[in-house]
């Protein structure tokens, strides 16, 4: 499960409109586009809240976003390798990630929680350790 703090979005959000003009440059943006309502694909087009935020940033700094759908478990390595200019996707800022990428200030923070079936209410960590219950999460 990932805490939603968006990373590496080019700290331009805090800059005045006149501070940057990228001259229409195309910015390649890596995203795991499977996280609605933040980023998802509908009718072959990347849509969502993050897409709208990036569109506004690009409007202000004169750039064109090019969304590159990428698997979550390799997204930071691909960014560090130069495959994109930035990553815009649900991201938890960690010390490990901070060593390989630069983070912007977060523009949204969403709480995390654990979901479980009603009939498993009151389950303990021992139930997971014994194999009576299973836990699923996303890699990366």
Regions inferred by a protein language model and the residue ranges of each:
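Short, polar/charged alpha-helical segment
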Residues: 40-62
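Acidic, polar ligand-binding/catalytic clefts
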Residues: 55, 59, 64-129
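Short, well-ordered beta-strand core segments
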Residues: 87, 134-135
């Amino acid at each position: 499960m990932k805490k939603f703090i968006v990373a590496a979005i080019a700290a331009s959000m805090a800059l005045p409109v006149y501070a940057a003009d990228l001259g229409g440059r195309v910015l390649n943006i890596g995203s795991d586009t499977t996280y609605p309502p933040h980023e998802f694909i509908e009718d072959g087009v990347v849509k969502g809240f993050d897409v709208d935020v990036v569109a506004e940033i690009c409007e202000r700094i004169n750039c064109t976003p090019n969304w590159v759908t990428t698997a979550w478990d390799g997204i930071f390595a691909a960014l560090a390798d130069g495959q994109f200019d930035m990553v815009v996707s649900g991201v938890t800022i960690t010390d490990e990630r901070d060593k390989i990428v630069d983070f912007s200030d977060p523009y949204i923070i969403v709480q995390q929680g654990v979901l479980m079936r009603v009939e498993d209410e009151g389950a303990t960590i021992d139930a997971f350790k014994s194999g009576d219950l299973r836990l699923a999460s996303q890699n990366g």
